[in-house]
Structure formats: C-alpha cells, structure tokens
C-alpha cells in the first residue's frame, strides 16, 4: 500500500485517511498524465460502506482498473479482517474513484501492445489456489504482486521458493514488490523485497533491509513464455 503504507492499523477506519489517500491518487494521476507508463499502486479503496485493500492500475491520467485483495490473513501478526473486506465478499464489478467509474475485480486482465498481465496481493500468493493461477489460465503472461511481507526466521527463502514455483507453475513472469523501511516496526519488520522471476528462474532482486529507495529493472521474455 504505497500511498498510505500498510501499517496504519485502525487508522484505516478513519475517513480522513481514506479521503487523503484518494487525493494523493488524484495528484499522481495529474502528474503522470503525459506518461505512457502503466503504474500499479496499492491503497485502501472505499466500496460502498466497506474498505478493500486494492491495487489501482493507472496510465496517462486514467484509472484502468481496481483489483481487490482476495485472501485476508487473520492469524499470528496479521488481522486484516478487522479493517478490510475480501474480494470474495464484494459483489460490485465497478467502483467510482477519483471521479472515474472503473472496472473492479480480482479476475481483471490488463492488455498492452506487448503482453497481458494480472495482479494479486500479498497473501493471495500463499493461498491454496492463488488468483494468479486463474489469471494465468485466462491468458496472463506476467503476474504482479503488491505485498507487505514481513520478515521471520527462514521466511525469505520460503518466499523465494514460493514465487519460483508459482512462476513456473503458471509459466509466467512474476514481479513481487514488498514494503520496506518506510513502514512502522511496532509489530513486525519489512525488508523491502523486490523480486522478478521468469518461469521459475530469478532474474533480479533488490537489496534487503536497504534504507534507501530502490529500483530494479529486468526484461521478461514473453516470447519464451509463449513458446
């Protein structure tokens, strides 16, 4: 949730935070209006009287779609069901955001001139049947995962194995971006993991626990994925 941060806790129930998050998105839309690049931003989004943990896809000042998180962890250090509503409980297939009526759903596919991609959020990857499996069957060649994945003993290696296997299973590229040093450390610690996989193989990774902003860049060979 790059706009608000993931560790806001009960502030996710505050109208002021939700309104300011939408105002921040409007500023980003205005600032990127002349850019062709597609951006995926994590933020809380109000749907009727509920709040979803969502990925918002934007390009050239327009919102292309909103993808709600499907599986909300509610165990150990996580209690997301206290604040958010699962995609499984949202019946609407569109939402009004920043004055635009945009598609919404955990099954959305986004097409570019070069490829088709889908999105899942954090815990979705850890589910028995991740949304990315269905997205790949529908034609997604690249999966993006916006995450707030905290650290634990042995967890990083497990995460890398999980992404590698899912990328190979889906025969896809998999781009994973997680929260870093800007999050609160009251309950947990975030390493800022950035990982790019292609069909099970690691292509690029960020430096863990870096105290500065990072950018990792790598090409994903979609022709190889299609072969």
Describe the function of each predicted region.
Residues 1-227:
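Enzyme catalytic cores with a strong preference for nitrogen-chemistry domains
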């Amino acid at each position: 949730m790059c706009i608000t941060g993931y560790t806001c806790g009960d502030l996710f129930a505050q109208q002021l935070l939700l309104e300011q998050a939408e105002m921040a998105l409007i500023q980003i839309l205005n600032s990127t209006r002349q850019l062709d690049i597609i951006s995926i931003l994590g933020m809380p989004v109000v749907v009727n009287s509920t709040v979803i943990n969502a990925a918002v896809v934007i390009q050239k000042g327009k919102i292309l779609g909103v993808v709600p998180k499907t599986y909300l962890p509610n165990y150990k250090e996580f209690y997301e069901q206290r604040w958010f509503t699962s995609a499984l409980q949202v019946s609407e297939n569109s939402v009004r955001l920043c004055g635009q009526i945009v598609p919404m759903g955990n099954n959305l596919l986004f097409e570019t001139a070069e490829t088709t991609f889908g999105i899942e959020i954090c815990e979705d990857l850890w589910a028995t049947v991740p949304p990315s499996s269905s997205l790949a069957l529908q034609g997604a060649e690249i999966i993006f995962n916006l995450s707030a994945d905290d650290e634990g003993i042995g967890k990083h290696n497990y995460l890398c194995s999980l992404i590698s296997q899912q990328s190979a299973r889906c025969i896809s590229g998999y781009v994973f971006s997680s929260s870093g040093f800007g999050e609160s450390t009251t309950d947990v610690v975030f390493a800022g993991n950035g990982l790019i996989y292609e069909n099970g193989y690691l292509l690029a990774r960020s430096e863990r626990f870096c105290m500065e902003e990072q950018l990792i860049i790598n090409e994903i060979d979609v022709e190889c994925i299609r072969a």
